[in-house]
Amino acid sequence: MQSNPGLFMFLIFMLAPTLGWTQDHLPLANAATAARIRVNDPQETQTYFGDSQPETASDTRYATIDEATGPFVPPEPGTASLDPIVQPLPEYTDLSSSEEARFASPFSNDSSQFDIGLNLYSAPPFAGGLIVFGPNVAMKIGGFVKADFIYDFNPIDSTDSFVTTSIPVDAPPRTNSRFHARQSRLSFDTRWLSDDRVVRIYVEGDFFSEDDQFRLRQAFGEVGSLLVGRTWTTFTDVAAAPATLDFEGSVSNVNRRQAQARWTQMIFHEDLKLALAVEDTRFIIDAPTGITGEARNPSPDFVGHLRLDRERAQIQVASLFRVVGFQPTGQPVITRSAWGLNFTGVYLVTETTKVYSQILFGEGIGSYRDLPDAAPTAVDQGGLLPMFGWMIGATHNWNESLSSNFTYAQNDLGTTAFQNPNDVDQTTYLSANLIWSPLERVKVGVEYLYGTRKNVNGAMGDAHRLQASFIFDLP
């Protein structure tokens, strides 16, 4: 994996004006010195800045910066030392719950009663931890290191995630071991107040790309009801996503992130939310044999969902509509209308147990699961493929440090008589795990995975996998 030190410096210089830092405040004079910042404890009700005086000299509930090679010493009131520059600290900032609420974004789902067990889908909560403050602005730096140790008992071509469509049929027996840390993640959540409104920028990336290069997962701006940028599609429901250690997840879950412009609005009462979005589109077609051409996207994806939130339950109905096309070489574009519906639900059985479910169906939506949207229906014709998927699962906290998740899902893609007989017809996915948190922000887990693949001609293959993961969360 190649390092990119310029990326960090670029982010610092881009964010410095937003955070109210000027050239006088940037410690550039001494490259040999490094900054050490004491992270605020979210349990504390106050953080001391400016002229506020700690109760004792040993009280370290405030930020300070000193030389990395020197002792951690309290600064003079109102200053922090970074030889040879003396920096003024920001104005007094209260990190109590009221401060967290001050920067709360109305539709960003910072916290949820459904966050039971492992949650690698949502942004880190904007409270405590590694937060940088400036005048009327705050930035949370989040992320984690995740190391995966994988052993496959059967052939599967996707060694880093459990993609059941990559299970070969009638392959000779083989086993495989794989260690990687590609799911490790880094995020920057910046918020400020403008005319009594919270403006938010969120950028997130990981290393799950070719050659382990840093890649973009999410990048969006949000103010009030408007969100613009790349994030989870409006067609999905993060609250109903399975808590798996496996990166891929269930075969029916819509785990797709794409560029979009979304408007979210409460209707009738605060428990009912309507979201409407125009999103980027992708069309995958298996063209008839002997016909050359290109897939076309005449329209974006028009997506919406209606979500009902209650104290112990959440129900969401999502829909999408789009126009897709194929242009044979030298001929006009042939278009079809594709659609889909996604029903999801989450229910808190107890304070430590939740169950979730999903039903997904439509025509021409296979690409939302990296499958074909259309296939040949005759020698020189094609049509949209129907798809039907479903999932059930449960997550349980055994105690404060031990949790488990169970998920089973199935996805069926329609077939035609003119398809390649080795194309995918049906996939299934089963996951069961046990996750232990021996220390704060440290998790160790083991997960069993089983999947099947059935082809159009009826041939089947299956795979068993065992995965162990170590996760270290940023504060």
Residue ranges and their predicted role:
Residues 1-8:
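Bacterial N-terminal signal peptides that target proteins for export
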Residues 436-438, 461-475:
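Outer-membrane beta-barrel "beta-signal"
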Residues 20-153:
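N-terminal periplasmic/intermembrane-space "pro-region" immediately following the signal or transit peptide
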Residues 130-161, 169-284, 296-299, 303-314, ...:
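Outer membrane beta-barrel
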Residues 150-152, 193, 206-210, 235-237, ...:
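Sequence/structural signature of outer-membrane beta-barrel proteins
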Residues 308-424:
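Detector for outer-membrane/organellar transmembrane beta-barrel domains
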Residues 9-18:
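Bacterial N-terminal signal peptides
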